[in-house]
Amino acid sequence: MWVFVVENKTFGNRAFCRQVEGRQQFGDYSQEALQDLIRWRDIWAPALRAALRQIGGLSLKPIIARALQMGDELHNRSNAASSLFANAMAVPMMEAGVPKEALISTLDYLAGHELFFLGLSMASAKATADPARGIKYSTVVTAMARNGTEFGIQVSSLEDEWFAAPAPPVKGLFLPGYSEKDAGLDMGDSAITETVGWGGFVLGGAPGILSLVGGTPEEALSYSREMRQITVTTSPEFRIPALGFEGTAVGIDVRKVVQTNILPVIDTALAHKNPGHPIIGAGLVRPPLECFKKALSRFTEKYGLN
């Protein structure tokens, strides 16, 4: 299966992502769901590869910065980023000589897929976070992930150790035909976006997502302000217009999380507890505090700070 490769040119590391869709990756293996994977393999991915080779690659940082100022939070709302990516691919696909039918099919796919950029934002976040690993004495979180059973975090100075606790339920809104009783516990790798200060951290600049995850614009702004209390800095490159163009909060510090009892806020999709279903809704969730307490305890043990 084709993947995108995202390279951090400053540090030379890479991350990758698959096609994002709302059916098979949530456990729906119907023929209809699999058809999108087949079209990705045979039509859409080859067309996009031709375009990217035509222009020698595409810089994602400008797209991300613009999208954040256009109402995206780059986790469950990537409408602007997906459109900007589609615009960037249109002419190069034509210049690369992509056959007309494949060109039209790929453009139609991009135009109708508002969540397309999520895979690229996840890979960008991963490529951004990985160079922060292995820094002595650092208590900055470098990964957050969930598997429907456990929620785990990794911390810079503790390198590849995982600190896990039971995965929490997600509070949110459900698509027609589904309810709380159908939902599994929090799961997925997409919280890597919050790890670098996107997603729930920038809800204040993405009020459009509230119709999907629930909440009010005032609450969204309060989440973005609250995240500043548990992070080490703000981004000089990614800014939120609704907060006076302040930079996004970045660098979750396990010490601050434990000291304040403020947990990172994550907006996330809801998966069914049983296989055979597409996405069933979306909402907000916070990691278990126990993850951060375990990490801080290990940190003090490692560096003899008891």
Question: Model features per residue range: what roles?
Answer:
Residues 1-306:
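Anaerobic metallocofactor- and corrinoid-dependent redox/one-carbon enzyme cores
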